[in-house]
Every structure is written in structure tokens, then in C-alpha cells.
Amino acid sequence: FDRWQQGKANEGEGTMWLSRQHHDMQIKGNPVGYYIPDYNSLDISNGTLLVLAHYNVQNDKINRKIRLVDDVVYEVDLATRKIIWTWKASDHIDEMGFDNAALKAMQNYENEPKTEGGGFDWFHQNCVSYLGPNKWFNGGDRRFHPDNLILDSREAGILAIVDRQSGRIVWRAGPYYRDGDDKKLGWIIGPHHTHMIAKGLPGEGNILVFDNGGQSGYGPPSDMAPNGIGVMRRQHTRVIEFNPLTKEIVWEYSPSTANKPDQVLGIKLFSPFISSAQRLPNGNTLITEGANGRVVEITKDFDLVWEYISPYLWDSSAPGARNLVYRAYRVPYDWVPQLSKPPEIPVDPGANYRFVIPAEDGSKPDFGIGRTPIWKRQTGGQ
């Protein structure tokens, strides 16, 4: 399945066969790719594999002047290693709900990159997975057939479900969030890791998405987006879980929902690219704030119970190297059988005003630790 397109892997090298795989691949048998209790037996010698890849095409409906870096999903038979099904995003432009202003902005894009394999990255799909068994299909809604695919577009701000048989988009949120049921979601900007929470996990059947913020969407030109590209902008991230039938938000982690009365500056969550969200068996959500290399576990009530910041830099020799993390998953200890299970030590975070850095000799200054802080005495704790 790597014989998909001829190209150069690196400048100066000869032409070779490339799959041009990017962002995601999923083996059928686990719809989300992360741990689900009693649902983790994968036969990698049989079944099928979804691969998300790039493919350069010309499509005059999108842009008459330059080629596209299109997104293509191909399904591979693992036994024969043959491609048995293909879906190209550009073939379905008429099913995506773009208005005339958006289509005009795409037509006006003219910055043809000069690099090998370059072009107009008009859709920028970053995930694909099977829906898997779910209550909506069991209730008679064929849009949610377990073999159907769910995906999203960073550039267009679209979430979509694709019928595996016909290839048509049978369910969609976006690209506009100002009318109808889509309005309940608020604007989804530059999304990543859109997937249906799998059967056996809290929230099963709902859709979970890392709504990055930053900029995305096509529309009329403005001072902020003079070419009509990246017209929707927001400088914070949301993680949202919603009912795909009603599009009612069930749970949202964002500055507007998760701030506590004593948090003067509010929560800090912003990654304008990459990132993900995983529903854990205990009902918590593991969030990868990828641009900052930060992974956190958040409870349903928005408490931070675990945090990790990656110390590893991408290309540490380059100026401005960053500790990016594309996507992190929590897995059980026995998924790494060569390691013994370590002791788990609970941590009491305590109150911030009790945190004191000791001096070089180990002593701690007395700032009234253990007594009611001055601001609480003066305000009555309000």
C-alpha cells in the first residue's frame, strides 16, 4: 500500500514510491485507537487499515490556477496489502456546505509553493477513524453505521461522517456555526482528533473534539483576513463533547466553563495546531495541549488531577526548538509488559498560598503558613 504516488522523499534524492501518509492511521477493531476496556484485541494480519495521506490533484471547483495538496483516505486489506477503498476530500466539495464567499476565497488563493509535493493545502484533514458500534445506529439511524468514517478539516472547520458504501458525507457540523443546531456548538476553529467516544467508555456515542482556536475557515475578506482565508479566529482552546443528533454540548473544558472563583487569570489552554483529547475509563479526559508539550488529565468538574510537560525538543539544534507533542494516549501498565507496575502515590495539591520554596539550608520562611491568608481575613473570604 506504499505504492501510492511517485515523488521525492528529500531534495536531491531520486524519485521513489511514497504513501505520503500523514497525521493518522487506524486498524479496524478499535475505532478510536486508544485504550477501551474489553475492546483491545487487534488482529494485524487480517482486517483493514485506514490510512490518511496526501495526493496532489487539480480541481477547478476549488482553484483553477494551482494544484491542491488534497487529503485522501485509503482502506488497506491487511492480508493482501492492497488498497480496497479510496476517498478524496476534493471529490466532495459540493457536500461541504461552502457559500459563494468561501468558494471565491479558495479560487483566489495563488501562493503556489515551489517545494516538491507542494500546493494549496485547502482542507488539511488531520484525523480519520471508524465510528465503531454505537447506540445511534442500534436505534435505527444509518448515518452512524459502525463502518462509517469520522473526520475533520482544520482549514475549513468542518466535522463530517462519511458513508463507507457511497462515499458521501451523511452528517456534518460546520463550516458555519451561526444557524440551526450548529449554532449550539459555537464556532469550531482548526479542530483536531474528532472522534466518537467508543462503546464501553463514559459518554459513549458522543463526539469528542479538540477545538484548537487560532484561525480557520473561508469567507468574505476583512481587515484581519484580507484574502478571505482564516476568517474565524479565537485565542483559546476548547475541548467539547456533544450529542451528534441534537448537537447539544454535554461537556466543555474552556476558560468560559472551567474557571473557579479563586482563579484570577483563569485556566490556560491554547494550542492553535496539533493536539488531542482522550476519554478515560474513569470518566476523566486526557488532553494533549500539543503546541506547549503539555498533557493534562481533567475531571468532569474541571479539576486538574495530573500534568506532564514534555522535556523533549523537536530538532533541539534548530533555533526556537519546541517541545511539541502531536497526540498522547493513556494506556494500562500491562500494555508495556516488560516494565513492572510502579507504586502509585497520591498527591494532595493543597492550596497555592501554602506553597513555599525553601532556602538553601532547607529552612522555610514563616509567611503565616497555616493561618488564614490576609486577603481572606480582609474580605471575609469573598
Where are these regions (language model features)?
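Histidine-/acidic-rich catalytic cores in large beta-rich domains
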Residues: F1-Q382
